Amino acid sequence: MKATTCIACAVCALGLTAPCLAEEPLPAAAAAVVSVQPAQDESAASWLEPAAGEWYDLKGELAMTISGSTINGCPVTAEANCTYGYPRTGHFTISESQGTRTLTLDLLGHKSHQYLIVDGKTALRRSIHPEYSESVGGIYLGMTKDDVTAKYGYPNEITADQGMEHWSYGLHRMDVFFQGGIVMAVRLYKGSDIKFDKSGLGADAAMAAYAEAYKLAAVPVIPADDGVLSPAYDLPQGEKFHVSQRYVQLSVD
Protein backbone atom coordinates (compact mmCIF):
# COMPACT_ATOMS: atom_id res chain seq x y z
CA MET A 1 0.00 0.00 0.00
CA LYS A 2 1.55 3.29 -1.09
CA ALA A 3 0.77 6.61 0.54
CA THR A 4 0.65 8.21 -2.92
CA THR A 5 -2.39 6.19 -3.94
CA CYS A 6 -5.84 7.30 -2.90
CA ILE A 7 -7.09 4.17 -1.18
CA ALA A 8 -10.75 4.93 -0.69
CA CYS A 9 -11.45 1.31 0.17
CA ALA A 10 -9.32 1.57 3.27
CA VAL A 11 -11.65 4.30 4.42
CA CYS A 12 -14.59 2.18 3.36
CA ALA A 13 -13.36 -0.56 5.69
CA LEU A 14 -14.07 1.86 8.50
CA GLY A 15 -17.64 2.28 7.31
CA LEU A 16 -16.84 5.75 6.00
CA THR A 17 -17.67 5.46 2.33
CA ALA A 18 -20.48 4.11 0.17
CA PRO A 19 -20.37 2.56 -2.32
CA CYS A 20 -17.02 0.95 -1.59
CA LEU A 21 -14.51 0.76 -4.41
CA ALA A 22 -13.96 -2.87 -3.44
CA GLU A 23 -17.46 -3.60 -4.73
CA GLU A 24 -16.66 -1.97 -8.07
CA PRO A 25 -12.89 -2.39 -8.70
CA LEU A 26 -11.06 0.31 -10.61
CA PRO A 27 -7.58 0.20 -12.12
CA ALA A 28 -4.97 1.56 -9.75
CA ALA A 29 -4.24 4.48 -12.06
CA ALA A 30 -7.90 5.49 -12.15
CA ALA A 31 -8.19 5.25 -8.38
CA ALA A 32 -5.39 7.78 -8.02
CA VAL A 33 -7.00 10.42 -10.24
CA VAL A 34 -8.66 13.30 -8.41
CA SER A 35 -10.11 16.47 -9.81
CA VAL A 36 -9.64 18.84 -6.86
CA GLN A 37 -6.25 20.27 -5.92
CA PRO A 38 -4.98 20.07 -2.32
CA ALA A 39 -5.67 22.99 -0.04
CA GLN A 40 -2.78 25.45 0.04
CA ASP A 41 -3.38 26.35 3.67
CA GLU A 42 -0.67 24.72 5.81
CA SER A 43 -3.03 24.20 8.75
CA ALA A 44 -4.05 20.74 7.51
CA ALA A 45 -0.46 19.51 7.36
CA SER A 46 0.27 21.14 10.72
CA TRP A 47 -2.65 19.37 12.38
CA LEU A 48 -1.87 16.05 10.74
CA GLU A 49 1.87 16.11 11.45
CA PRO A 50 1.71 14.29 14.84
CA ALA A 51 -0.74 11.82 13.27
CA ALA A 52 1.57 11.01 10.34
CA GLY A 53 2.20 7.36 9.61
CA GLU A 54 0.20 4.15 9.50
CA TRP A 55 -2.91 3.44 11.54
CA TYR A 56 -4.44 0.01 12.16
CA ASP A 57 -7.99 -1.00 13.01
CA LEU A 58 -8.82 -3.22 15.97
CA LYS A 59 -8.41 -6.33 13.80
CA GLY A 60 -4.82 -5.36 13.09
CA GLU A 61 -5.44 -4.40 9.47
CA LEU A 62 -3.93 -1.26 7.94
CA ALA A 63 -6.82 1.21 7.74
CA MET A 64 -5.32 4.66 7.25
CA THR A 65 -2.06 6.27 6.19
CA ILE A 66 -1.41 9.96 6.82
CA SER A 67 1.38 11.83 5.08
CA GLY A 68 1.78 15.59 4.77
CA SER A 69 -1.67 16.94 3.97
CA THR A 70 -2.99 13.66 2.56
CA ILE A 71 -5.12 10.91 4.09
CA ASN A 72 -4.77 7.54 2.36
CA GLY A 73 -3.07 9.40 -0.47
CA CYS A 74 -6.13 11.60 -0.95
CA PRO A 75 -5.45 15.35 -0.66
CA VAL A 76 -7.12 17.34 2.08
CA THR A 77 -9.01 20.08 0.27
CA ALA A 78 -10.50 21.81 3.31
CA GLU A 79 -10.33 21.76 7.09
CA ALA A 80 -12.59 23.23 9.76
CA ASN A 81 -12.96 23.49 13.53
CA CYS A 82 -9.37 22.38 14.08
CA THR A 83 -7.84 22.55 17.53
CA TYR A 84 -4.08 22.33 17.91
CA GLY A 85 -3.65 21.72 21.63
CA TYR A 86 -4.14 18.40 23.37
CA PRO A 87 -6.19 16.48 22.58
CA ARG A 88 -6.75 17.81 19.09
CA THR A 89 -9.78 17.50 16.86
CA GLY A 90 -10.62 18.59 13.34
CA HIS A 91 -12.89 18.14 10.35
CA PHE A 92 -11.13 17.33 7.08
CA THR A 93 -12.54 17.14 3.57
CA ILE A 94 -10.59 14.80 1.31
CA SER A 95 -10.85 14.31 -2.44
CA GLU A 96 -11.43 10.71 -3.48
CA SER A 97 -11.86 9.34 -6.99
CA GLN A 98 -15.63 9.24 -6.47
CA GLY A 99 -15.95 12.69 -4.92
CA THR A 100 -15.25 14.47 -1.67
CA ARG A 101 -15.73 13.20 1.86
CA THR A 102 -15.50 14.88 5.25
CA LEU A 103 -13.95 13.04 8.20
CA THR A 104 -13.89 14.06 11.84
CA LEU A 105 -10.60 13.11 13.48
CA ASP A 106 -9.69 13.13 17.17
CA LEU A 107 -6.04 12.54 18.06
CA LEU A 108 -5.23 11.65 21.66
CA GLY A 109 -2.97 9.58 23.85
CA HIS A 110 0.77 9.04 24.01
CA LYS A 111 3.37 6.55 22.77
CA SER A 112 1.83 3.04 22.49
CA HIS A 113 -1.51 4.53 23.47
CA GLN A 114 -1.81 7.18 20.79
CA TYR A 115 -5.19 6.76 19.13
CA LEU A 116 -7.01 8.29 16.18
CA ILE A 117 -10.79 8.32 16.55
CA VAL A 118 -12.59 8.59 13.21
CA ASP A 119 -16.06 10.16 13.13
CA GLY A 120 -16.37 9.68 16.87
CA LYS A 121 -16.88 5.94 16.64
CA THR A 122 -13.94 4.12 15.06
CA ALA A 123 -10.65 3.85 16.94
CA LEU A 124 -7.36 3.30 15.13
CA ARG A 125 -4.07 2.50 16.82
CA ARG A 126 -0.41 2.67 15.87
CA SER A 127 0.31 -1.06 16.15
CA ILE A 128 -1.04 -4.23 14.56
CA HIS A 129 -1.57 -5.76 18.00
CA PRO A 130 -2.56 -3.88 21.17
CA GLU A 131 0.43 -2.80 23.24
CA TYR A 132 0.28 -1.95 26.93
CA SER A 133 2.29 -2.06 30.13
CA GLU A 134 -0.24 -2.28 32.96
CA SER A 135 -3.77 -3.63 33.17
CA VAL A 136 -6.44 -3.56 35.84
CA GLY A 137 -8.31 -6.77 36.56
CA GLY A 138 -7.37 -7.94 33.07
CA ILE A 139 -8.59 -4.73 31.42
CA TYR A 140 -5.94 -2.81 29.49
CA LEU A 141 -6.07 0.57 27.78
CA GLY A 142 -7.21 0.10 24.19
CA MET A 143 -9.23 -3.05 24.99
CA THR A 144 -12.50 -3.43 23.08
CA LYS A 145 -16.00 -3.36 24.53
CA ASP A 146 -16.55 -6.96 23.46
CA ASP A 147 -13.48 -8.12 25.34
CA VAL A 148 -14.48 -6.23 28.48
CA THR A 149 -17.99 -7.66 28.27
CA ALA A 150 -16.63 -11.18 27.78
CA LYS A 151 -14.66 -10.80 31.01
CA TYR A 152 -17.09 -8.90 33.24
CA GLY A 153 -20.47 -9.05 31.53
CA TYR A 154 -22.61 -5.99 30.96
CA PRO A 155 -22.31 -3.10 33.42
CA ASN A 156 -24.97 -2.05 35.90
CA GLU A 157 -25.14 1.38 34.32
CA ILE A 158 -23.99 3.13 31.15
CA THR A 159 -23.87 6.94 31.00
CA ALA A 160 -22.35 9.61 28.76
CA ASP A 161 -19.39 11.35 30.38
CA GLN A 162 -17.44 14.14 28.67
CA GLY A 163 -17.51 12.53 25.24
CA MET A 164 -16.91 9.04 26.58
CA GLU A 165 -19.13 6.07 27.43
CA HIS A 166 -18.99 5.41 31.17
CA TRP A 167 -19.61 1.83 32.31
CA SER A 168 -20.18 1.20 36.01
CA TYR A 169 -19.68 -2.21 37.62
CA GLY A 170 -21.19 -1.77 41.06
CA LEU A 171 -20.29 -5.22 42.37
CA HIS A 172 -16.60 -4.62 41.72
CA ARG A 173 -16.67 -0.90 42.51
CA MET A 174 -15.06 -0.33 39.13
CA ASP A 175 -15.77 2.06 36.26
CA VAL A 176 -14.55 1.69 32.67
CA PHE A 177 -14.51 4.56 30.17
CA PHE A 178 -14.68 4.05 26.40
CA GLN A 179 -14.14 6.27 23.39
CA GLY A 180 -14.33 4.99 19.84
CA GLY A 181 -15.19 1.55 21.23
CA ILE A 182 -11.96 1.09 23.22
CA VAL A 183 -10.97 1.53 26.87
CA MET A 184 -9.58 4.96 27.69
CA ALA A 185 -9.60 4.65 31.49
CA VAL A 186 -10.22 2.17 34.30
CA ARG A 187 -11.20 3.51 37.72
CA LEU A 188 -11.14 1.58 41.00
CA TYR A 189 -13.04 2.93 44.01
CA LYS A 190 -11.98 2.28 47.57
CA GLY A 191 -13.16 -1.16 48.65
CA SER A 192 -12.88 -2.61 45.14
CA ASP A 193 -11.80 -6.24 44.87
CA ILE A 194 -9.97 -5.49 41.60
CA LYS A 195 -6.21 -4.90 41.51
CA PHE A 196 -3.61 -3.51 39.14
CA ASP A 197 -2.23 -6.67 37.55
CA LYS A 198 1.51 -5.99 37.54
CA SER A 199 1.82 -4.36 40.95
CA GLY A 200 -1.03 -6.15 42.70
CA LEU A 201 -2.08 -2.82 44.21
CA GLY A 202 -5.68 -1.74 44.70
CA ALA A 203 -7.58 1.43 45.49
CA ASP A 204 -6.82 1.15 49.21
CA ALA A 205 -3.04 0.85 48.81
CA ALA A 206 -0.73 3.58 50.09
CA MET A 207 0.52 6.06 47.51
CA ALA A 208 4.09 5.27 48.54
CA ALA A 209 3.49 1.70 47.38
CA TYR A 210 2.45 2.98 43.94
CA ALA A 211 5.52 5.20 43.76
CA GLU A 212 7.77 2.25 44.56
CA ALA A 213 6.02 -0.24 42.27
CA TYR A 214 6.10 2.03 39.23
CA LYS A 215 9.35 3.90 39.99
CA LEU A 216 7.50 7.22 39.98
CA ALA A 217 9.50 10.42 40.28
CA ALA A 218 7.36 11.44 43.27
CA VAL A 219 4.82 9.90 45.62
CA PRO A 220 1.33 10.67 44.23
CA VAL A 221 -0.47 13.31 46.26
CA ILE A 222 -4.16 12.77 47.02
CA PRO A 223 -6.03 16.05 46.37
CA ALA A 224 -7.45 17.71 49.48
CA ASP A 225 -10.80 18.42 47.83
CA ASP A 226 -13.26 15.63 47.15
CA GLY A 227 -14.06 15.19 43.47
CA VAL A 228 -10.71 16.57 42.33
CA LEU A 229 -8.45 14.32 40.27
CA SER A 230 -4.70 14.54 40.70
CA PRO A 231 -2.34 15.45 37.87
CA ALA A 232 -1.15 12.52 35.78
CA TYR A 233 1.76 10.41 36.99
CA ASP A 234 3.63 8.79 34.11
CA LEU A 235 3.75 5.01 33.74
CA PRO A 236 5.54 3.11 30.93
CA GLN A 237 4.30 3.21 27.32
CA GLY A 238 2.40 6.47 27.72
CA GLU A 239 0.01 5.22 30.39
CA LYS A 240 -1.10 7.57 33.18
CA PHE A 241 -1.95 7.08 36.85
CA HIS A 242 -4.34 9.39 38.73
CA VAL A 243 -5.66 9.43 42.27
CA SER A 244 -8.51 11.16 44.10
CA GLN A 245 -9.92 10.85 47.60
CA ARG A 246 -12.25 8.08 46.45
CA TYR A 247 -10.47 6.18 43.68
CA VAL A 248 -7.34 5.45 41.65
CA GLN A 249 -7.30 5.44 37.87
CA LEU A 250 -5.28 4.06 34.95
CA SER A 251 -5.87 6.10 31.81
CA VAL A 252 -4.64 7.31 28.45
CA ASP A 253 -4.50 10.90 29.74
Q: Where on the chain are the PLM-derived regions?
A:
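N-terminal signal peptide c-region/cleavage motif recognized by signal peptidases
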Residues: 17-19
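N-terminal helix-cap/turn-to-beta initiation motif at the start of protein domains
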Residues: 38-56, 66-68, 136-146
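Positively charged n-region of N-terminal signal peptides that target proteins for export
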Residues: 1-5
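A cross-family detector of function-defining hotspots
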Residues: 57, 143-191, 200-253
